[in-house]
Amino acid sequence: MEPSALTLTEAAEAYLDHLRDARGCSPHTVSAYSRDLGKLLAWTGSKGPARAADLDKKTLQLFLSGQARALAASSQSRLLACLKGFGRWLMERGLPRNPAQTIAFPRKETKLVSVAGEAFLSEVLDDPGTDEGFEAARTRFCVEMFYGSGLRLSELTGLKWNQIARDGAWARVLGKGSRFRTVPLTDAAKASLDEYRGLCAAKGVATSAGPVLVSARGKPVGNRIIQRTVTDRLHAMGRRGKSSPHVLRHSFATHLLDHGADLMAVKEMLGHASLSTTQKYTHVSMAKLKETYAKAHPRA
């Protein structure tokens, strides 16, 4: 159906269906774009066009100028990426031009990623804790995978038993853009996997297929539960800064680079589509280098 026959709301819903069904975008991406388009629809409800065919550059510029006051630069960039994709989709279906095509991205604020220290993480990983229950074993495995293999939260909660090698040496994970990659497991991760697998088997939970991360009753657990338990573990060990599975992933990448790992190899292990995404970790390593230089060099 041509854009001229669609209301803006109908077009937005059809675009989200396209992302979900034809493009195979992750639920996280579809949800984020749904929120972004929802902002546009709420704004146009009183100030903009009702028909998709009437969406133009001026309308989008006015909308974005209002959003700029409420959103961080990175959120503005994602919002504009959503609008560019939406405009391109409309153009492919008959709109004369992409109304968002020539709108420039805002400059992103340069922020260093949050990283936990190596000594602290060694303490976290070496301390078995006092809780020997099922959830504690699952949390230990999660921490090992986030820091030892650099997984994203959604990649670990989506991991299936049949994606892990029988000897536990590697796992094949499904990342962003529906791209698979193979990641190695550390010896400590393999040991924590064996412990957790044994507890699953003792509870009658299948460990040949199905999701790896489950509750004590064998039900799949989602991102929120794993986020909470890992964050609680880091706090219990004395972490005062930002604490999350993603901090462990940031630490994985930064510590690899600190110890001389090749940037391209780190990019592949993280599952980044672009090298520029991985390069943000070099800023952290450079910051550490400058700090070391300032403390150690007699002329600094």
Where do the protein language model's features map onto the residues?
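Conserved catalytic core of the tyrosine transesterase superfamily
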Residues: 1-300
